[in-house]
Each structure stands twice: as structure tokens, then as C-alpha cells.
């Protein structure tokens, strides 16, 4: 009798995680036009950001000032000059508060905007569902469409985006 609850738990977990992954946006999808609150408390409409530069990199991370998220943010900080030369604006998003995002940005001198999304409006708009935290993903957007998706990468995020851009002519 005991194997049944375990089998049920595994089956339900598999459905949960596969449906969460299936909901995530893919290359070719229209990028969500949604607003969030920046680390300064200002409102930021991603649709406006998409129009300002040829590319926008919207990257998601689970929690500010944790090891993997710090590596990811610092890699993008360190690659920001090269990415900016390629016309890439960067926006980071997590479910953290405005104060947590502000402290994270200041501590690591991030030159890009961080969005505080505790109500998960932006996170959900990008199809990220699951345990209440953002999944570590990045979406490169051009002309309102997702042209590249980087999943789960931390310290190589900037390099991966630059490699993709090098293939775009």
C-alpha cells in the first residue's frame, strides 16, 4: 500500500513541473508588454524598453544576493559594455522587494535596471510558474519578439548572448 502514495506524488510532481516548463515563453513568441516597479520605485513598462534599443535582455533570477543570482548579475554587469555596443538593454527581474533589489544593485554596482516583482506580474507574463520564485532564464527581445532564450545559466549569460548576437550578422 505504501508505494501508491509515492507513485501518486511522483506523477503529480511530474505534471506540475512539466506544465510549468511548457508555459515558459519560447523563441518566436511575442514578448510581453507589462509594467513593473524598478529598484528606485519607479514604474517601468517593458514595451517602452523594447523600443529604445535594438535588443532588450530580460533576465530572471530566483533571489537577490544569493550565490547563483549574484554570479548571473555580475556576469551581465561585466559584459554590459560589450552588450551595450551591440544595442542590448538589460533588465533583471525577481520576486524580491524594491529594497532588496536596490541593495543588490548597489552592492554589486549593476549598471542596469532591476525590477522588483513580489506580486509576480512580470514573472507570470513570461510564463514562469512554479514555486513562487522566478526561474533562471533570460530572453533576448528584438522588435517585440523573443529571438533567443538562455536557460539556467549563471556566469556565462553575457557570453552566451554575445555568441548568439555574433551569429546575427
Task: Say what each PLM segment does.
Residues 70-108, 122:
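Structural microenvironment flanking redox-active thiols in thiol-disulfide oxidoreductases
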Residues 3-33:
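N-proximal helix/coil linker or "cap" segments that precede and/or mark the start of modular domains
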Residues 134-169:
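Thiol-/selenol-based redox modules, centered on thioredoxin-like
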Residues 91, 105-136:
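Short, internal strand/loop/helix patches
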Residues 59-65, 95:
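Aromatic-flanked redox-active Cys/Sec active sites in thiol-based oxidoreductases
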Residues 34-55:
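A short beta-strand-turn-helix
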Residues 57-58, 90:
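Hydrophobic beta-strand anchors of alpha/beta hydrolase catalytic cores
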Amino acid at each position: 500500500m505504501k508505494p501508491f502514495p509515492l507513485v501518486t506524488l511522483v506523477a503529480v510532481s511530474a505534471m506540475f513541473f512539466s506544465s510549468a516548463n511548457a508555459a515558459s515563453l519560447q523563441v518566436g513568441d511575442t514578448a510581453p508588454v507589462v509594467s513593473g516597479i524598478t529598484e528606485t520605485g519607479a514604474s517601468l513598462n517593458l514595451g517602452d524598453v523594447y523600443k529604445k534599443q535594438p535588443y532588450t535582455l530580460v533576465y530572471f533570477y530566483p533571489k537577490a544576493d544569493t550565490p547563483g543570482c549574484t554570479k548571473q548579475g555580475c556576469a551581465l554587469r561585466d559584459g554590459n559594455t560589450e552588450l551595450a555596443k551591440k544595442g542590448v538593454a538589460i533588465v533583471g527581474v525577481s520576486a524580491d522587494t524594491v529594497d532588496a533589489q536596490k541593495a543588490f544593485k548597489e552592492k554589486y554596482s549593476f549598471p542596469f535596471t532591476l525590477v522588483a516583482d513580489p506580486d509576480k506580474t512580470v514573472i507570470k507574463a513570461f510564463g514562469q510558474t512554479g514555486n513562487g520564485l522566478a526561474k533562471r532564464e533570460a530572453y533576448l527581445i528584438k522588435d517585440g519578439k523573443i529571438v533567443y532564450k538562455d536557460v539556467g545559466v549563471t556566469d556565462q549569460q553575457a557570453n552566451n548572448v554575445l555568441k548568439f548576437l555574433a551569429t546575427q550578422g
